[in-house]
């Protein structure tokens, strides 16, 4: 999501591929995948210090919104 990251591409790609593989293994449809990833996101944020939660949530929402392709023909 971010353009500049403190994580290297290999670390990011490995984790993302593991998550995609798990969703594919369970043949999770889009709605179930989003529910699981949403709950995972919530658990990660709730594990942070309470004072940080609101700010990180807002940054996450902004990054997610910016990364979604809003064209009607996008796939």
UniProtKB/Swiss-Prot annotation:
One Pfam family in the UniProt entry: DUF1414
Record-linked InterPro entries: UPF0352 (IPR009857), YejL_sf (IPR023202)
Coiled coil: none
Family, as annotated: Belongs to the UPF0352 family.
Stated name of the protein: UPF0352 protein AHA_1665
Organism annotation: Aeromonas hydrophila subsp. hydrophila (strain ATCC 7966 / DSM 30187 / BCRC 13018 / CCUG 14551 / JCM 1027 / KCTC 2358 / NCIMB 9240 / NCTC 8049)
């Amino acid at each position: 999501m971010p353009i500049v990251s403190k994580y290297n591409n290999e670390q990011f790609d490995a984790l993302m591929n593991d998550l995609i593989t798990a969703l594919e293994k369970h043949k999770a449809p889009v709605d179930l995948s989003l529910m699981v990833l949403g709950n995972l996101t919530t658990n990660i944020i709730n594990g942070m210090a309470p004072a940080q939660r609101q700010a990180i949530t807002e940054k996450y929402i902004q990054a997610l919104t910016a990364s979604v392709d809003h064209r009607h023909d996008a796939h």
